[in-house]
Design a protein with these regions (language model features):
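ABC-family P-loop ATPase nucleotide-binding domain
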Residues: 1-13, 224-231
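ABC family nucleotide-binding domain
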Residues: 4-5, 10-210, 214-217
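H-loop (His-switch) and adjacent beta-strand-loop-beta switch element
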Residues: 214-226
Length: 231
């Protein structure tokens, strides 16, 4: 498989001198197109900080990260913003849906930010709502949707710009077990493909079965990457 992410000695600290605290320390790993990589570990182990550096949100203090063979932190701020808009899709735990917009308008936001025509953006949004099984909910406000449906709207919004890298932060934390498994079945069977890499931060051991590999973190360091036996 082609390498989607190559992180080398990634390090991030906060504070200086005797007050310096390492959030992530010398983390190196590769992730590949066509796989789902879980990043797991206790709260405060550096998982979200690591993904923030990989996705161009938080600059590392040392180390490098290449996404699709591009050293993202060698780019200018404008280039990094363009990289995030075109290459990375985010699905957050609390969805971040705008209550005053329709479901379709929420999904269209990344395209509007890219200055795409409004009507084309809405058509594309409706297509991806269809992909996640919610085209008939396109004109509803998010408050009219269930938690699982809102999560699928967030997935559609992450997909609409056709990113190479999808990042999920605790995607099932606020969902019941059955809904969480349905979301992961959907991600595994409908969203993953050979030209896309999916990274998922989670505490939810109920969904570990959907990972191709699991990277474990403790105290800002990786303590192992394991391939699931049935993959």
């Amino acid at each position: 498989m082609d390498t989607a992410i190559s992180a080398k000695e990634l390090t991030k600290w906060f504070g200086e001198g005797d007050l310096r605290t390492y959030a992530v320390k010398e983390v190196s790993f590769d992730a590949y197109f066509g796989e789902i990589l879980f990043v797991v570990g206790p709260s405060g182990s550096g998982k979200t900080t690591l993904l923030s550096m990989i996705s161009g949100i938080l600059r590392p203090d040392s180390g490098t990260v290449n996404v699709d063979h591009v050293d993202i932190w060698s780019l200018t701020p404008d280039q990094i913003a363009e990289f995030r808009l075109n290459k990375v899709g985010f699905v957050f735990q609390d969805y971040h849906l705008f209550p005053r917009l329709t479901t379709a308008e929420n999904v269209a936001i990344p395209l509007i930010l890219k200055k795409k025509d409004w009507n084309e953006s809405i058509r594309d949004a409706e297509h991806y709502l269809d992909v996640v099984g919610l085209k008939n909910k396109a004109q509803l406000a998010p408050v009219k949707l269930s938690g699982g449906e809102q999560q699928r709207v967030a997935i559609a919004r992450a997909l609409v710009a056709q990113p190479d890298l999808l990042i999920f932060d605790e995607p099932t934390a606020s969902l019941d077990g059955d809904t969480g498994r349905r979301i992961m079945e959907f991600v595994k069977n409908r969203i993953l493909n050979d030209s896309r890499c999916i990274l998922i931060v989670t505490h939810d051991s109920r969904i570990f079965e959907y990972a191709d590999r699991i990277m474990r973190m403790e105290d800002g360091k990786t303590v192992g990457i394991e391939k699931r036996a049935d993959h």
